[in-house]
């Protein structure tokens, strides 16, 4: 029988790959149409009903694009809708959330030092936060506040900052950042699925029927598109953050997250202004650099300890790994081959934090990361990188034997 751990690892990889592919498609088409729309030029010779045009060159050919706010005289039977990129990005991201964070909740989702809850409770909180977050956002947009574009943006930013702080009070730092990205992406994809596309269909149907569309549908869709425009870059940051513990695994991670959203605004403002041919506001890059330097500084600020934490107890979900007969030898192996990097204060040159914030110093930490040790150093040679600590083939076999023995013992 094919090993469950190996199959699960490949399933996670497939979901991540699919998620990246669909995200590239969604973000690429989104950025393209934003640039196209802002760069449209009104010329005298445009056909009746045309709002503007753009000439582009790519791949050895020329493209002449015209935008109509009313139905053109010759309406084609087929219209290309840009929506499935968004839907599949969210679905693949949710699948990855289920595989990695729900399937491995005891390790990746729950930090008992932050909040000691069961895996089912943590998963329910996660799901509820995504659903409630969209409802709150949608109600704010539909409230009287929604008529004030910038006032709404400020309130939404406050909501996002609160969610970032809240997630760090519930989950591991890595899961908190992932959830903040998922929360934001849920808003963006729901905007497309529940607001933008339905409103566009109403407008298209009216135009084809020769009716004058209600301007409110376009205004609402434009507002949601504006939000998506400025939220895109922070979501990408949170997608990548689990590789960088200095972002998610530090004392002021929620403040870092808040600043990332401001960086997303300054960067997108430069591109939006440039595409609209309204100049190149270089001040946005100065602000972005200042924010990034502030983030770097925050990542090194020490955490003020408020009490003693018991880090020695092995969680029940991982007891079989610590109780296995191979564990004593594995602990010695990890101590000599891995802990110079995977320590609270790494001694390996150039490391300020342990890779992915994975600590392998105590029985509890080694047992909790048994599957990762098995995959990374037992079944593959990914760890240590370049085999810098000279782990031997026999030692890798020991790691495999330990994991398989513990799993077999649990199943008996």
Give the predicted meaning of each segment.
Residues 30-73:
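Membrane-interface amphipathic/juxtamembrane segments adjacent to transmembrane helices
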Residues 69-94, 200, 215-234:
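Loop-to-transmembrane boundary segments
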Residues 74, 81, 101, 279-284, ...:
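Aromatic- and Gly/Pro-enriched helix-to-coil junctions and flexible linker segments
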């Amino acid at each position: 029988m094919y090993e469950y751990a190996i199959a699960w690892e490949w399933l996670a990889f497939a979901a991540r790959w699919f998620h990246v592919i669909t995200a590239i498609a969604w973000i690429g088409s989104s950025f393209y149409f934003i640039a196209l729309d802002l760069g449209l030029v009104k010329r005298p010779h445009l056909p009746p009903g045309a709002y503007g045009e753009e000439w582009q060159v790519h791949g050895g050919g020329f493209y002449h694009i015209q935008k109509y706010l009313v139905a053109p005289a010759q309406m084609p039977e087929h219209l290309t809708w840009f929506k499935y990129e968004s839907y599949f990005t969210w679905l693949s991201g949710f699948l990855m959330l289920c595989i990695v964070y729900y399937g491995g909740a005891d390790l990746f989702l729950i930090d008992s030092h932050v909040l000691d809850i069961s895996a089912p409770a943590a998963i329910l909180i996660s799901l509820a936060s995504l659903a409630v977050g969209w409802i709150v956002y949608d109600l704010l947009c539909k409230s009287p506040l929604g008529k004030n574009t910038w006032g709404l943006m400020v309130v939404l930013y406050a909501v996002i900052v609160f969610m970032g702080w809240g997630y760090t009070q519930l989950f591991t730092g890595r899961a908190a950042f992932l959830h903040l990205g998922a929360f934001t992406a849920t808003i963006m994809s729901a905007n497309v699925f529940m607001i933008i596309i339905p409103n566009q269909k109403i407008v298209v149907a009216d135009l084809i029927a020769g009716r004058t569309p209600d301007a409110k549908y376009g205004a609402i869709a434009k507002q949601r598109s504006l939000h998506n425009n400025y939220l895109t870059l922070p979501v990408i940051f949170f997608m990548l953050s689990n590789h960088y513990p200095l972002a998610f695994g530090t004392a002021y991670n929620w403040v870092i997250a808040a600043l990332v959203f401001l960086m997303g605004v300054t960067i997108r403002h430069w591109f939006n202004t440039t595409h609209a041919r309204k100049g190149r506001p270089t001040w946005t890059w100065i602000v972005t650099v200042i924010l990034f330097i502030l983030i770097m500084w925050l990542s090194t600020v020490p955490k003020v300890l408020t009490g003693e934490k018991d880090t020695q107890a092995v969680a029940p979900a991982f007891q079989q790994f610590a109780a296995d007969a191979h564990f004593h030898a594995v602990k010695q192996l990890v101590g000599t081959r891995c802990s110079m990097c995977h320590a609270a204060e790494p001694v390996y040159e150039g490391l300020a934090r342990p890779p992915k914030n994975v600590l392998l110093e105590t029985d509890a930490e080694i047992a909790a990361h048994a599957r990762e040790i098995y995959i990374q150093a037992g079944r593959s040679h990914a760890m240590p990188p370049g085999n810098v600590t000279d782990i031997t083939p026999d030692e890798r076999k020991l790691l495999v034997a330990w994991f398989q023995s513990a799993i077999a013992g649990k199943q008996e």
